[in-house]
Swiss-Prot record:
One of its GO terms (molecular function) is phosphoglucosamine mutase activity. HAMAP family: GlmM_B (MF_01554_B). This is Phosphoglucosamine mutase. The modification Phosphoserine is found at residue 102. Binds 1 Mg(2+) ion per subunit. It comes from Mycolicibacterium paratuberculosis (strain ATCC BAA-968 / K-10) (Mycobacterium paratuberculosis). The keyword Nucleotide-binding does not apply. Keywords: Isomerase, Magnesium, Metal-binding, Phosphoprotein. GO terms for cellular component: cytosol. It holds the Pfam family PGM_PMM_I. Activated by phosphorylation.
Amino acid sequence: MGRLFGTDGVRGVANRELTAELALALGAAAARQLASGSAPGRRVAVIGRDPRASGEMLEAAVIAGLTSQGVDALRVGVLPTPAVAYLTGAYDADFGVMISASHNPMPDNGIKIFGPGGHKLDDGTEDRIEALVGDAGPRPVGAGIGRVIDAEDAADRYLRHLSKASTLRLDGLTVVVDCAHGAASAVAPRAYRAAGARVIAINADPNGLNINDNCGSTHLDSLRAAVVAHRADLGLAHDGDADRCLAVDADGNLVDGDHIMVVLALAMREAGELASDTLVTTVMSNLGLHLAMRSAGITVRTTGVGDRYVVEELRAGDFSLGGEQSGHIVMPALGSTGDGIVTGLRLMTRMAQTGSPLSDLASAMQTLPQVLINVTVADKATAATAPSVQTAVGQAAAELGDTGRILLRPSGTEPMIRVMVEAPEKDIAQRLATRVAEAVSAAR
C-alpha cells in the first residue's frame, strides 16, 4: 500500500478508500503520537468537519479512535478548516482533526491533522502516525477513556478571531459570497456583515449532498452572474472547507490567488507589514506574479505545491504573506493556515482603504497565458519520468526559452499528472501543453 498521507492529509472516496475502520485507526494513531508527550492531565483534540454526508460517519469513527486512547474529543461541529486550526490553539488542545475533502466532490472525504497551535504536520510526523495505524497499543479503561465534549462557543470564538482581519469598516461595499454549500455557509456571511459589508450569500444551504456541486471556488459561473445581476463591487468564492478564496471583480472577471497575493503584498509593504519585503508562493504561480513583484522590489520565495510547504517557508523565514494561485492565502499574524474568510476580509479592506475597484487593484499583475492539462495515469512516478515524456518536456522548454515555462507535477491527492505551460501567446501554451500531455498519456 502507498503512503496514506498526501499533500493535504488523507483523502479518498468515503466508505471505499476512506473507511470508518481507517478513520478510527488514524484517530487512535494520531492520539498515540501527538498526545503522548502531553503534560499530566486530560488530553484534548479539537475535531470539526464540513457538511458532506459522510462527515458524521467519519467524525464518529475518529472520535472512537481518539477516546480509545484516552484523548477527549472537543467537537466543534461544521466549521471551516482554518477554524479548526485556530481553535486548536485557542482551546490549548494537543492537536486538531478536520474531516473534509476541501474542493473535491461530495463522495470524497478526507482527514487533516493539525499539531499544537494549529500548524499542519510535517512529513516526519505524518510518517510516524502512519506507522502506528493498526497498532492500537495499550488502551485505558474506566475513567481513563476519553470523553466527547461539544464546544458550544466554537463558532462565536472563530467569528471574534475573524473580526481582527478587517482594520476598517467595509460600509458601502456590496459583496456576493459563494459558500459552495460548505463549511463557510454559516460563518462567512456573518463575518462579512459584521465588518460592515452588504452581503448577498449564494450556495449557502448545505444538505450534505450539494457541497461543491457546480458552485464555489471551482465553478465560478453562478458567482459571476450574481455579481453582475446585483451590481456588486465584487464576488468571493470559497471551497467546501473555506480554506481558500477566489474573487471576481464587478464585471465578473476572475481575480485568482496570484492577483490576490500581489494586491495584499503591495498593501502590506505600504503599511510596513511585509516582513523582509518577501512573498512566499509555489511553483504553480504565474510568471506574471514574479514580474509584478520584481518591478515593485519585492522578493519571491518559491516552494513545492501545497499550502503546508508555503507555511513551512513562512515559519522558517519569519515571513508574513504567502499562498497559492488556487486561493490558499496565509498570513501568519492572522492564522496558522490558509483562511478564505480572512483573505476575503483583507481584500475588501484594501478596496475600502484605497477607494479603488478590484479591477484596478488586480491590474498590478498581468497574467501570462497559462494552460493546465490534467492527465489521469496508473502510476504517477513512471509516467512523469518516462524518457518519451522527458524528451517532450525538453523540446517544449527549448522552444519557450526565457519567454515562458513548463511544469510537470504529479498530483498529491489524485492519480494524475498536471501539465502546466505558460507562454507569451495562448495558442503557443495550448500547443505545447497538448504535446506534453499526449506524451504523458501514452506513457501511462
